[in-house]
Amino acid sequence: MTAAAPGITRAPATMLPLSYLMAAAIAFLLACAGAASLAGPLTAHYYQPRVVALAHTVTLGWISLSIMGASYQLIPVVLERTMWSERLGRWQLGMLLTGIAGMVTHFFIGRWPGLLMAAAMVALGAGMHLVNVAMTLRGLGRFSFTARLMTMGFAGFGLTALFGLLLGADRIWKFLPTAFFPTLHAHFHLALLGWVAPMIMGVSARAYPMFLLAPEPDGWPAPAQLWGLALGVPAVVGGLTAWPALVLPGAFAVSAAVVGHLTWVARMARDRKRPRLDWGLRFVLTGGAFLFAGASLGLGLALDLFSGPRVAMAYTALALGGWASLTIVGMMLKIVPFLVWYRVYSSRAGRAPVPTLAQLGWPAAEGLAYGLLTCGMAGLAAALAAGSAPLIFAAGAVLAAGSLCFCTTLARMLWHLAACGQRPVPTMGAHTA
């Protein structure tokens, strides 16, 4: 068995990551419904109270909670380290849910003092997670590619939370020396490129080979991703806030990371031994196609080939909605069945008939969710670029239907938890060699 972190004898119980993931799924459903209800405001500039509230429902409520929840299950498996404190993770979730709800509400009504208080709670919750991860990784002997990118991502998460807190305070006291919109753009790209991108790229390097039954990736894409993000993210953020000449080199560096990641994904899909792709795998692979489209549009913005708020919102939809969201949906369709099966059936395996992981899913609903969400994300990006309220509403309605199918699938998986009763549940241990 692999070594555990100092002073730790067990990994978090399955309900801890499930709690995060279910809260995130609810936020995803609300965000998709919100896209339809805000069709009118989404045809105008992106900096409006209700649009910013929607954006933070996606980035904090959906994406960030998903990544944090998944980390409580993936770190023991991918990095072979048991989590430091399950109790801290539970307290952190309460802090984050309260803070995120407060931020979204105060963004919606445009009240800055209340927003700042809620942002402070989110920053505190983020800090608690970073402490938990830091203590978990303490003493890790070898930092693999995945460990390095995840460490980079958690550092980016902390900086993004701090940056957002400063932006909120600046709306009250006006102390930041830089112009507001370039600073806002820097905050967004720090979140996207410094937090979301390294986490997805790092985890996929270990998780996708397991899911696809493919060889672990190697070669030039590893340094391309690592150095592309390590050099590109500071350059983009610094260029947007202070030195515009850095934006283009930073964009090219990030593009190199994207090319490296997509090359790995394509190789794993080509060399896989799994003959048939389930819907979770189709989601993550389709997310790669959206990443290519979003990165191309982002590079075009850096080259001044495109400009304006409509193109910027289409770029955001491709990056956060197409790539990040579809990838997370696919990962959830792989992670949640495992967590439910482990909690309900692991102690009975070998002694009584138990369902397989595949039997916990609902392929019909997953397939419907795939069709609706992929078409809805593509349609939303096109509708935002066109600035058409009817098209945005239609795309939002399709997304809402797709997210409902996704959440219904998760609910059907969670129904198996009712079989637990009062039976003692084993704790999910770290992955063994």
List the predicted regions and their residue ranges.
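Hydrophobic alpha-helical transmembrane segments of multi-pass integral membrane proteins
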Residues: 1-433
